[in-house]
């Protein structure tokens, strides 16, 4: 069974925090909005990864668009390769999901950006210019100074926040950071610790399932 999807992952490298599954299954769009709360100058390194499972969908996906406080943000495409993506998060009781495989091989693109901010800022990533998709995308509030985040809006996705970043996802220049304490409406927190073996919530998006993390 081949699953057509476009997926997005966002990695805040120095903060050791990642946002997974910011793209709808069987969709042709992905996106994410991050609200950053700082009170002093802060440099933030971000990686944005897009995954496309079907070759012909490459032509449907627009180049990644990014904005910082409504101003265009330069994104550098640093690598293109083939990887796999976890599909278990998308499984539901619906008939066409029951035989969904656990993984799907994808054409993957890795983008890089550096943010220099000194006050509250909003950064957004989009694979489309159509406003009709905006309600689909999640919004996450992050305070890097207090090591705190809150999922403001999950949109219509099964996104999840993972901190610290999974070992399998870390690139060689990532440094291990401190863990965040997450609160909010079903933040779907995943404490990955030092292992790549973890479980995440597979409940419907309407169902609240808040899990507290321990340092």
Curated annotation (Swiss-Prot):
Specify the superkingdom.
Viruses
One GO biological process this protein is involved in is:
viral process
Q: Where is the composition biased (Acidic residues)?
A: 193-215
Give the span(s) annotated as Disordered: 179-215
Please give the InterPro entries that the UniProt record associates with this protein: Poxvirus_C7/F8A
What role is this protein assigned? Plays a role for multiplication of the virus in different cell types.
**Family to which this protein belongs:** Belongs to the poxviridae C7 protein family.
Protein name (record)? Probable host range protein 2-2
Query: What is the organism field in this record?
Result: Myxoma virus (strain Lausanne) (MYXV)
What taxonomic lineage is listed for the species of origin? Viruses, Varidnaviria, Bamfordvirae, Nucleocytoviricota, Pokkesviricetes
